[in-house]
């Protein structure tokens, strides 16, 4: 019988992305023939996921990059809704950075993620989670601040496009994943016993914190206004009237139907 030996890999090629192979035992037979011993190196495999913090689903449209410990960029890409797979990354410490969030979908940039690529041929997984914008709309009584049901509201963007419409139910109305930017909250119909409110302009910031917007309604008082012809005293229809307070704030506006 021949002698038995062990072949070990003590050092892999620098910056190659290969991982040390398992030791191999082999026996040299005393038969005069050439014997071949093959040691195969596997390599590192890294899977990067960009997911929604709430649903865990993969997100498309995020611009990501990976830098090494020296700050050198080794990879950049735009997510496509599937995990990003990389091979042969040298072992070491890396940082995953989101340079641009998919704000069109209402997401905000995530904090950078530091990760290690270790000496293994198994897939090493790294996940970066994106938070999203959250806006709470409050419709409140001007006198005591309690929430009002029965108001019809809508939100429009800077281009005048309607983003959302709803009727209040006495609870704050929450909207998620609004694109950061400028918006207008409009009351199209006031609750019974209240006057129509002025529009509220607000800006959605790029943050995962809850952003609050409040629109107040003033209670209506018992007041009958009539629009008449100065000569005939006849009631006039189709007159557009506005009531403003001492500060110039619009309290109510309407078009007369039969003079009232």
Predicted regions located by residue number:
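Solvent-exposed loop/turn and edge beta-strand elements of beta-rich ligand-binding domains
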Residues: 1-260
